[in-house]
């Protein structure tokens, strides 16, 4: 919980006389990656019109990590999609921005009559994608155009 200690020290001889000027000593505590990312919700819900073009934004997912994200990568969260159900008409209909968690359409062919809803399993991984991870669900409703 304490990131830095500031000490004030000086050297003295055996008889107590100063032999050096007083100096500040800083001790910086390095964060240990001891927390997993946590999504702000277990289930995220969003919607998008059928037939939209690739690149259309759908929603955003958010995860936080209690570890230090300023001096280390321990608290830097990277997002990815682990799975999409159903895999129709393509197994990759959506993408998630690695650093922001913004989910957008990546393929054409969204059709409400064919597939009214998609379920995505989203993963958040700390250490900028190389550490501990956790998952949440994103449900995308396809709206009639």
Swiss-Prot record:
Domain of life: Eukaryota
Keywords: Calcium, Cell adhesion, Cell membrane, Glycoprotein, Membrane, Metal-binding, Repeat, Transmembrane
Annotated glycosylation sites: 24
Pfam families attached to this UniProt entry: Cadherin
InterPro entries attached to this UniProt entry: Cadherin, Cadherin-like_dom, Cadherin-like_sf
Bilayer topology: Single-pass type I membrane protein
Record GO cellular component, one term: plasma membrane
SUPFAM superfamilies found in the cross-reference section: Cadherin-like
Extracellular side: 1-145
Residues covered by the Cadherin domain: 1-39, 40-145
Cell compartment(s), UniProt: Cell membrane
Keyword Magnesium: no
GO BP, sorted A to Z: homophilic cell adhesion via plasma membrane adhesion molecules
GO MF term list: calcium ion binding
Keyword Signal part of the UniProt annotation: no
Subunit structure of this chain's protein: Interacts with CDCP1 and CTNNB1.
Function recorded in the entry: Cadherins are calcium-dependent cell adhesion proteins. They preferentially interact with themselves in a homophilic manner in connecting cells; cadherins may thus contribute to the sorting of heterogeneous cell types.
Domain notes: Three calcium ions are usually bound at the interface of each cadherin domain and rigidify the connections, imparting a strong curvature to the full-length ectodomain.
Protein name stated in the entry: Cadherin-3
Organism: Sus scrofa (Pig)
